[in-house]
Regions:
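Divalent metal-coordination and catalytic microenvironments
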Residues: 34, 73, 86, 116, ...
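Predominant activation on well-ordered alpha-helical scaffold segments within soluble catalytic domains
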Residues: 28, 49-52, 124-131, 158, ...
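Contiguous, non-catalytic segments that form substrate-binding/exosite surfaces or channel walls
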Residues: 39, 43, 152, 302
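Histidine/acidic-residue-rich, glycine-tolerant segments that coordinate divalent metal ions
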Residues: 71-72, 93-95, 99-111, 117-118, ...
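Non-cysteine beta-strand/loop elements that form the S-adenosyl-L-methionine
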Residues: 85-87, 200, 359-365
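Acidic/His- and Gly-rich active-site-bordering loop/insert found
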Residues: 5-112, 117, 121-141
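Metal-dependent amide/peptide-bond hydrolase catalytic core
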Residues: 2-9, 225-399
Length: 399
């Protein structure tokens, strides 16, 4: 699937090698600097400062303070034409790092465990490459380099869109480093590639009592346990077996002492879907099952359900174009059209609701620890490769 987004015909021979030779050390140094000082959510001020320092001297129109600490840097080509956006996320996760790297996180309880330090440095590398006079002069249009805070649950992408970042953009692309995919492999697909991610909290109410006299109480712990079990039937018995859906209870809490039956218990979880109709149905079914079980055990359940990131849906032509550019850049053996989406989620979905584009996975190896784990570490040789792909996506589109 190569699509008809634009004709993929330009030769990119030597682009990755040039980036490695001219900017490789800068890209790696930036990645390590960001990795040492991970920042959470919208509070990415130091990371933004590092990015601005790395972009200093390039022929870019730079806007700061977008979505609080986001940056939009625009490179204008020699000729007129459309604007292509390339996006990277900058925030980290509240995880204690266990990689043992010499540039490990210096901040207790924080880590770049989703590769955003790599995404940011790769985009800086692409900005340096495209800012070289020969490549810049070949562009008919402009490239927006979008550095976004708060991907990890903060919805920074929505704020960027609401603040007008993509109003003049004709297409947009983003890369995500991906463990489990062979090193250097570029993978994407048309249509849904990442799921919608919604969240719920639930309070289970019973009546408390002495642990030795359960018959005089309505045990919220036992009710909660039965609710957790019953919720598993929402997907397994109410959703078409060929329709992807996930319902996970990830939090449960109750009680203050071993011999006291608590009157309340708390559950928290996530629901992932790819189908908008199913997504809209899920809150009602979660509440009905939970309350039905609780009432049958002399209790009740209150549900607080939050719709969060929508499905990440790649434009068909843009996805085909991205695979075509990657094939021309790295060879057919380095390209994979995905058969199935991931049930993880991405706030890049907000950009794709407004602008055609594609979210692309870049493999870091099949034996690399997974995303959101304290052991995540990847070979930094992937960084110039990612920079080359980002640069090529813009270069071909605007040539």
């Amino acid at each position: 699937m190569r699509g008809d987004f634009v004709d993929v015909s330009q030769s990119f021979e030597g682009l990755q090698a040039e980036i490695e030779e001219n900017f490789g050390e800068k890209i790696v140094a930036l990645r390590r600097d960001i990795h040492r000082e991970p920042e959470l959510g919208f509070d990415t001020e130091r990371t933004a400062e590092k990015v601005l320092t790395a972009l200093d001297g390039l022929p870019l129109d730079i806007e700061t303070g977008v979505a609080e600490n986001g940056i939009v840097a625009t490179l204008k080509g020699k000729g007129d034409g459309p604007t292509v956006a390339l996006r990277a996320d900058m925030d980290a996760l509240p995880i204690q790092e266990e990689t043992g790297l010499p540039f490990s996180s210096e901040i207790e309880g924080r880590m770049h465990a989703c590769g955003h330090d790599g995404h940011t440095s790769m985009l800086v590398g692409a900005a340096h490459a495209l800012s070289q006079e020969d490549l810049r002069d070949s562009l008919s249009g402009a490239v927006k380099f979008v550095f976004q805070p708060a991907e990890e649950g903060g919805g920074g992408g929505k704020v960027m869109v609401d603040e007008g970042v993509v109003e003049d953009v004709s297409s947009i692309f983003a890369l995500h480093l991906w463990p489990g995919l062979p090193f250097g492999k570029v993978a994407t697909k048309a249509g849904p590639i990442m799921a919608a991610a919604d969240a719920f909290e639930m309070e289970i109410r019973g009546s408390g009592g002495h642990g030795a006299m359960p018959h005089l109480a309505a045990d919220a712990v036992v009710i909660a346990a039965q609710v957790v079990t019953a919720l598993q039937t929402v997907v397994s018995r109410e959703v078409d077996p060929v329709e992807p859906a996930v319902l996970t209870v990830g939090e449960i809490g109750a009680g203050t002492a071993f011999n006291i039956i608590p009157e309340k218990a708390r559950l928290g979880g996530t629901v992932r879907t790819l189908n908008s109709n199913l997504r809209e149905r899920m809150p009602g079914r979660v509440e009905a099952v939970a309350r039905g079980v609780a009432k049958g055990m002399r209790g009740d359940a209150n549900l607080d359900y939050t719709f969060s990131y929508p499905v990440t849906v790649n434009d068909e032509s843009a996805a085909g174009y991205a695979l075509g550019v990657a094939e021309d850049l790295f060879g057919a053996h380095s390209v994979q059209e995905l058969s199935n989406p991931s049930m993880t989620a991405e706030d890049f979905s907000y950009y794709l609701e407004d602008v055609p584009g594609a979210f692309i996975w870049l493999g870091v190896g099949e034996d690399v620890s997974g995303l959101h784990t304290p052991q995540l570490a990847f070979d930094e040789e992937i960084l110039p490769r990612g920079s080359a792909l980002l640069a090529a996506l813009a270069l071909q589109s605007l040539s």
